[in-house]
Design a protein with these regions (language model features):
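Active-site-proximal alpha/beta segments of enzymes that process anionic O-linked groups
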Residues: 2-3, 10-116, 198-215
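Metal-dependent active-site segment of extracytoplasmic phospho-/sulfohydrolases and closely related
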Residues: 3-13, 23, 141-173, 183, ...
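Short, solvent-exposed loop/turn segments at secondary-structure junctions
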Residues: 10-13, 82-86, 125-129, 167-169, ...
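Glycine-rich, phosphate-binding/catalytic loops in enzymes
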Residues: 20-26, 138-141, 176-179
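Structured loops at beta-to-helix junctions and adjacent beta-edge loops in soluble globular domains
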Residues: 54, 123-125, 186-188
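Histidine-centered active-site/metal-ligand motif
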Residues: 129-133, 166-177
Length: 215
């Protein structure tokens, strides 16, 4: 299986214990972990463009497939929220029209299938779409994601970066989230004493692809 970069918009470490997850806490003890820093306001499109461009810039190509990270890694894109509907082999509208179960399962299914042939950059938007206005279903959303990550690892993916570009929603406004997201990966973050910046996630995935594929 080829390396994968999977971003989950709007999850935080604090809910791993609260929601009694199994897979993600176990992964934290096996591979490298850290904290992603992204100051308010945080928007999905701007956050993901920073990752795809590998630098903190407002320069956004009209076609995400032309972004530097995609061109360098030749990665397939799945459900990337730089536009609405999302961009890639699987795509949804950024509203609540697609259930969180449907999105998560379809993204992971497409990811496993595609990673057999190429590196993959994928996103899950469910926490961001549903938890701004309904915290009561938080652990249901987390549990579906946790189970899907287990399927991903059991599917043979061994080189990966799992992250959230920002933490949980903390209010009804779109750009209002906790400022620290998760980083769980088979490649070490650049500074163990510091947070991971968004543009560094793109650089780390580039390095992961190069080291895994020997290019």
């Amino acid at each position: 299986m080829y390396p994968i970069l999977l971003g989950i918009n709007g999850i935080s470490y604090g809910s791993f214990t609260e929601c009694e997850l199994n897979v993600l806490p176990r992964l934290m003890n096996i591979v490298d972990r850290g904290v992603v820093e992204n100051k308010k306001p945080q928007y999905p499109d701007k956050s993901w463009w920073t990752i795809l461009n590998m630098e903190p810039t407002n320069n956004t190509p009209s076609d995400p497939s032309l972004a530097p990270l995609v061109k360098l890694t030749r990665a397939a894109l799945i459900n990337i929220p730089v536009v609405n509907p999302t961009y890639g082999l699987y795509s949804i509208k950024l509203d609540q029209g697609t259930s969180y179960e449907e999105e998560v399962n379809n993204v992971i299914g497409a990811l496993i299938k595609t990673a057999a042939k190429a590196p993959v950059i994928a996103a899950i938007t469910a926490p961001d779409r549903f938890l701004h206005n309904n915290q009561s279903i938080k652990c249901n959303v987390y549990s579906v994601i946790d189970e899907a990550i287990g399927s991903l690892i059991n599917g043979g993916v061994s080189a990966f970066i799992l992250f959230s570009p920002y933490g949980e929603p903390v209010g009804p406004n779109e750009g209002d989230h906790e400022e620290y997201g998760i980083y769980i990966a088979t490649i070490s973050r650049p500074r163990h004493y510091d947070t991971v910046k968004l543009y560094e996630i793109g650089m780390l995935f580039r390095d992961l692809v190069e080291s895994t594929l020997g290019v």
